[in-house]
């Protein structure tokens, strides 16, 4: 910046003189001092998505308020630190999409089973649910569905509720950067070995005097509350000082606040007889919380939702899928992957249909058994809400018109539901008029002929002679499926390319499951997720999907720049590398990854499909 120069004052005076506003040396120095003080200060207001300030008196008498960018809304000019300094109460009211999904799932289950449930009614400590979790079979489940969580599940092997509390908390930047993950997993393995001889054996922790703080997590601090308790029990902190320590840990975007407690903590532990290496290790773990860690209470509430969603996925998969689709956008996976996963688990999914679909996804009989699921399951009928270009109001009119009587034709539907040509074309593109018009090309022809009739002619039938068109090839139908609804119930796109991929010696995700550790392999799939978390030190994680399932790819930083263009831009990616297949002690399933050595962008093989596939979900 210009004012960093050693001659900044001379430059400023010359600039001012050129503008016709000369400055003396003293005034110029004051301007420079002010400019330096303002460096790094935000110059705009960013609205908190769910922050509310509650006051006894009128808010505008206490804090400065200005109009927000959105019409009819106001925003406070102070941030949370300003409010805290003034002892004003701020409450963050944040939404979780999974809460909506669970409510919808309970509603669907009540209609199906004839009994109303809420969270408290879900059976506790269900063995089949934990078996599913330990297999990392958690697509769509709250919190434990990400790549990192799925990799941790077969290592941590949750078998009871508190294990889930730790699970949702340990895969966070704080515990990872603080070096808490491996010590905790090692402690769990030591306890597992102990319990082979005595099922009720408790693992002794290194310092029994800190048992109140550390016993429940096997001697490794995972939560902020534990650090507070150690500071009180081991280092002589008062409750107020421990709370200040917690607040400094919670301010994870502002570095350095924890260091003011370093000497007091280490000296206090030393005076209490703890070795210096323990104090150093503990403080390093505390520093990890500065990279974002969970309070235990937060982890408990998240674990409850993780368990509830896992139970429903395991025992009511049809209700669960319908609820997830109706709650989009949310979660880690797009609707196409949620549907693919549900179908692999035996759930029957029926297409959008103007003569059968509701606005939302619905359940349809007859009930049929699914392997491994106790209760017979209905099919899931995709809802009109999934049709791109068809608004909720138009979908509602369609359903309302259908309740008065079955549609005789596409023309009859358009007239009675008051749908214009664009809305009819949206239905046709989604293959939702098949029962009325036949195959998709015929639907598109019929939809193109529809014009909204003037009021006096809405009940007057008119038309022209039907034209018979040939049906579209499968590839074209798949293209339209993705463009119109974001998913397909036909074959996966890679099934159409499998013969060409086989000539490139590319294995499917299913075939890779039988490949031993260390083998050099090739895989190819549609890129569904890209991740490059800060805690991974530059490593990128990519998920590919083919017709048999997902393949997880690891890209080390040294190779990221070499293959950057293909890794960041490809929709269809072929990867060659070393197959990793490791099994944790006691784990039923291994953790599988493909470590990239080279890759190739094969997006061109998708043709026009590449332009309509939903983009990958990228996280940083």
Model-predicted segments: where are they?
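Alpha-helical scaffold/interaction cores of sigma-54-like transcription cofactors
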Residues: 1-441, 448-452, 531-535
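Low-complexity, acidic/Ser/Thr- and charged residue-rich accessory regions of DNA metabolism proteins
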Residues: 2-94, 353-357, 366, 370, ...
